[in-house]
């Protein structure tokens, strides 16, 4: 990844960074909740973004 990024790329990376977090604990506590963890987590070394 270059140090000089276009705004489009930077915005894309920012979105992916926001998506890549665990689910909040209060969501797990909700009644009738079936979500245990965020299945769409991405590890920076294992799975690369399609850039």
Curated annotation (Swiss-Prot):
Keyword Zinc recorded: no
A Gene Ontology molecular function term of the record: structural constituent of ribosome
Recorded superkingdom: Eukaryota
One biological process term in Gene Ontology: translation
Keywords: Ribonucleoprotein, Ribosomal protein
PROSITE patterns registered for this protein in UniProt: RIBOSOMAL_L39E
Database matches in InterPro entries: Ribosomal_eL39 (IPR000077), Ribosomal_eL39_CS (IPR020083), Ribosomal_eL39_dom_sf (IPR023626)
GO cellular component entries: cytosolic large ribosomal subunit
Subunit structure: Interacts with IMPACT.
Family per similarity comment: Belongs to the eukaryotic ribosomal protein eL39 family.
PANTHER family to which the protein is assigned, alphabetical: LARGE RIBOSOMAL SUBUNIT PROTEIN EL39 (PTHR19970:SF0), RIBOSOMAL PROTEIN L39E (PTHR19970)
Protein name: Large ribosomal subunit protein eL39
């Amino acid at each position: 990844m270059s140090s000089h990024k276009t705004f489009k790329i930077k915005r894309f990376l920012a979105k992916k960074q926001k998506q890549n977090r665990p689910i909040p604990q209060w969501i797990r506590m909700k009644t009738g909740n079936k979500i245990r963890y965020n299945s769409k987590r991405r590890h920076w070394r294992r799975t690369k973004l399609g850039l």
